[in-house]
From Swiss-Prot:
UniProt KW Cytoplasm keyword: yes
Keyword list, A-Z: Cell cycle, Cell division, Chaperone, Cytoplasm, Isomerase, Rotamase
UniProt-listed Enzyme Commission number(s): 5.2.1.8
GO biological process: 'de novo' cotranslational protein folding; cell division; chaperone-mediated protein folding; protein transport; protein unfolding
Protein name: Trigger factor
Catalyzed reaction equations: [protein]-peptidylproline (omega=180) = [protein]-peptidylproline (omega=0)
One Pfam assignment: FKBP_C
Gene name in the database record: tig
Coiled coil: none
Domains: entry comment: Consists of 3 domains; the N-terminus binds the ribosome, the middle domain has PPIase activity, while the C-terminus has intrinsic chaperone activity on its own.
Keyword Isomerase: yes
Top enzyme category: isomerase
Family to which this protein belongs: Belongs to the FKBP-type PPIase family. Tig subfamily.
Protein source organism: Francisella tularensis subsp. tularensis (strain SCHU S4 / Schu 4)
Gene Ontology cellular-component annotations: cytoplasm
Length: 438
């Protein structure tokens, strides 16, 4: 086999590979003879079909099957011999004639080689959130609202009321698609509608009609409506007032708590602290990763981005439970490209840093992280034992330990400031971020 390496710009290069004719023809001949012994053909007994007839009728097909098997073997050997780190590959067949060498080009996309420097340029705003009894009481109040019962009342609309409404949304005086609905239930203050919509209903009475003006958010999914000033003609058809359950032993049992109200409040606080810790870690880590992407200079392999896009589509399909009749491949790659590119770039940067630094996940550190994570489950010890039996889960934990160490290492060199934030705003932002990332 003859291999010619043609270097191209950046992370691209090509291998021109030539396989001797006798090697190809020999394999094809053997496959034709093997086929002749098993194929059924009119006029011949099984195993007695002449190889010449098989070649005449199926020779081209057999040759292509042989080549399809042989090409990956040859370019894999060439890649190994040339010590190339390949991210993606496309094969272009050049010459394929009996009695002549097989020639093909393997167009390669390589993993970029780069070194990350300038960590001091990274700016991180570290959120500081105080979790007090006030936030715990508010969380319990939110849980009470989840179990609220509603009864119709004759009064003006107030916060926390459930209202049944009709509405027609208009942009530039014309009704826009998706902006009209009838008999929609809205809980005032829940945030289920765009900002300003629910506030505009406060003070209305049953049977009242009103036109409000609201501006759609900048990041609204429908780009035609993003930042657009619109009007909504609203009719209130029913007003219901919420009645919240008392916080007593019966109420806390709905959450699987057996130790009474005091135990319930303690568990709520512990859960809030645990969730807050992981969210704040994530917020800091996201800023660190964003900063790393800004200072690192390299070309991102498109094949890796495409692979990540395909994985995101399959993950979406899985989240939808396989959704019958839904073809995820009909979704445009553009919907996933930005997130996919970020993930690929972050992964390449972290790998580059880890290759130059010696970060290790000690067994005790993995155990400690596991202990912390399983506290969110009803049966922590049982969950812990199940995870410890799963090699993939343990590998993920080790990777997370190393990722945390790397993040701390970058933070030691970065510009870090602190900013006080509200607990519930942090939770809300986290939910929005998760939804934006599918």
């Amino acid at each position: 086999m003859q291999v010619t390496v043609e270097k191209k710009e950046g992370i691209h290069c090509s291998l021109l590979i030539e396989v001797p004719a006798n090697e190809i023809d020999s394999v094809v001949s053997k496959e034709i003879n093997r086929t002749a012994k098993t194929i059924k053909m009119d006029g011949f007994r099984p195993g007695k079909v002449p190889a010449g007839m098989v070649k005449k009728k199926y020779g081209e097909q057999i040759r292509m099957e042989v080549i399809s098997d042989l090409i990956p073997q040859k370019y894999s050997k060439a890649i190994q011999d040339e010590k190339l780190a390949v991210a993606g590959i496309e094969v272009e067949l050049k010459e394929n004639k009996e009695g002549q060498p097989l020639k093909f080009v393997a167009n390669l996309e390589l993993f970029p080689e780069f070194e990350v420097t300038g960590f001091e340029k990274i700016e991180v705003q570290k959120p500081v959130v105080e979790l007090t009894d006030k936030e715990v009481k508010q969380m319990i109040e939110n849980l009470r609202k989840q179990f609220a019962t509603f009864s119709e009342v004759d009064k003006v609309v107030e916060k926390d009321d459930k209202v049944t409404i009709d509405f027609v949304g208009k942009k530039d005086g014309e009704a826009f698609e998706g902006g009209t609905a009838n008999d929609i239930d809205v809980i005032i203050g829940s945030g289920q509608m765009i900002p300003g919509f629910e506030d505009g209903i406060i003070g209305m009475k049953k049977g009242e009609q009103k036109t409000i003006t609201v501006t759609f958010p900048q990041d609204y999914q429908n780009k035609d409506l993003a930042e657009a000033e619109t009007t909504f003609d609203i009719t209130v058809k029913k007003i219901q007032q919420a009645e919240l359950p008392e916080v007593n032993d019966e109420f806390v049992k709905k959450f699987g708590v057996k130790g009474g109200v005091d135990t319930f409040e303690n568990e709520i606080k512990e859960n809030m602290q645990r969730e807050l810790k992981f969210i704040l870690q994530r917020k800091v880590k996201d800023q660190v990763f964003k900063g790393l992407r800004e200072i690192a200079e390299f070309e991102t392999p498109k094949s890796l981005i495409k692979r990540e896009i395909d994985a995101a589509k399959q993950n979406l399909l899985k989240q939808m439970g396989g959704a019958k009749g839904f073809d995820v491949n009909q979704l445009s790659d553009n919907l996933f490209e930005a997130n996919a590119k970020q993930k690929v770039e972050t992964s390449l940067i972290l790998d580059s840093i880890m290759n130059s630094q010696e970060f290790k996940a000690e067994e005790a550190e993995v155990e400690s992280l596991l202990d912390e994570l399983v506290q969110a489950y009803e049966e922590p010890e049982k969950t812990k034992e199940q995870i410890k039996k799963n090699d993939k889960e343990i590998a993920n934990l080790k990777a997370l330990v190393i990722e945390n160490k790397l993040t701390d290492w970058v933070l030691e060199q970065a510009k870090v400031t602190e900013k006080t934030e509200d607990f519930f705003e942090v939770i809300k932002e986290n939910m929005q971020a998760q939804q934006a990332g599918f």
